[in-house]
């Protein structure tokens, strides 16, 4: 899903830079990199994970990316232009639990690079640092002087592909600006039998 939308959004891209976190959101980025490389794009991945600690699905995607010839680098590639594309696959909904996440230097550096990139950004599931339930930025990112002192300094994606379900945070608070154009893919999942998460009070019988 990510790779298909990337091709549609940036059909003339020569280079796609994908910033990947250590979890499953990063795994989605790695999978997209493998496919885009196979489809003739030059893909450069900066991965904060490792094959030893990655979830099984992310590890499998890492193997496919390597086999496809994806370049792994510590920083964003030089020469990105407005026709190219950046993909934010760093955090996803990893902040939804409300548990504190240490904003380490590597993460902050990549967030800043996405913020400064001349190419547009496609976020996977939700822009990194945005909380999926509230649409507010993670306090530890806002407060960190290495990245910025206010939500306005955090990067905004031009497009966001949200997967499986629509996240409330994409449409509330800072999310409306941070997410850009929101695209949705349910990945073929049938959620019709899922228990309702809320009920409408006073609904007609």
Model features per residue range: what roles?
Residues 83-205:
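YjeF_N-associated NAD(P)HX repair module
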Residues 1-49, 54-55, 59, 149, ...:
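Small-residue (G/A/S/T)-rich helix-start motifs and N-terminal tracts that mark the onset
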Residues 3-92, 96-124:
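Nucleotide and nucleotide-moiety/phosphate-recognizing core
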